[in-house]
Amino acid sequence: IVDNAKILDVPIVVFESSIYDIVAEDEKSPCYLCARMRRGHLYAKAKELGCNKIALGHHFDDVIETIVMGMLYGAQIQTMMPKLHSTNFEGMELIRPLYLVREEDIIHWAKYNELNFIRCACRLTDNCSISETGDKGSMRAEVKKLIRELAAKNPYIEKNIFRSVENVSLDTVIAYKKNGVKHSFLESYD
């Protein structure tokens, strides 16, 4: 990461945290906890440095995988937002500048610029790491593979998944949550 930043002439601050020690004790969902804690540490460090935003590298493929994962594994319809205000760090905002960029375009750009990116090096992911073919154990890898298989039959699959959360008709939804409050279609049913 430091080498990539130097190549691109981008200033970078690297700092230590104790996230791994805490996450290692969570056998059920260490990746989720790690992601939440990393984000919290990024917010705190950014605020300490006088910044008002953190930028995450989620891209288009991450977004559609998250939509499908939410439906299949979380029984919910939701997405990653391209930007949002932090609920725990007042005055801070999260942005995802690569939101509309395809993963393969990022990979090609990185190779063209001779940049190297690390995959998660956490030993807790040994049994669920994402391979290039998406064959190994993680939910995200499974969903990535499913989307790839569906896209082989229908070239609009990725765009349709992405647009599905832009075209939600609340009149045809059994229930939805707004600001943490669940609403049922029965509330307005005559």
Where are these regions (language model features)?
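Residues that form or immediately flank small-molecule/cofactor binding pockets and catalytic motifs
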Residues: 17-19, 99, 122, 166
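Short, basic, helix/turn surface patches
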Residues: 36-49, 83-89, 143-164
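Charge-rich, low-complexity amphipathic helices
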Residues: 23-28, 64, 68, 76-77, ...
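A short glycine-/small-residue-rich loop at the edge of a beta-strand within enzyme catalytic domains
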Residues: 33, 55, 97, 101, ...
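ATP-dependent adenylation/nucleotidyltransferase module used to activate substrates
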Residues: 1-77, 81, 104-112
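Catalytic subdomain that performs nucleotidyl-dependent activation
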Residues: 61-142, 146-147
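The feature marks non-catalytic terminal segments
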Residues: 115-190
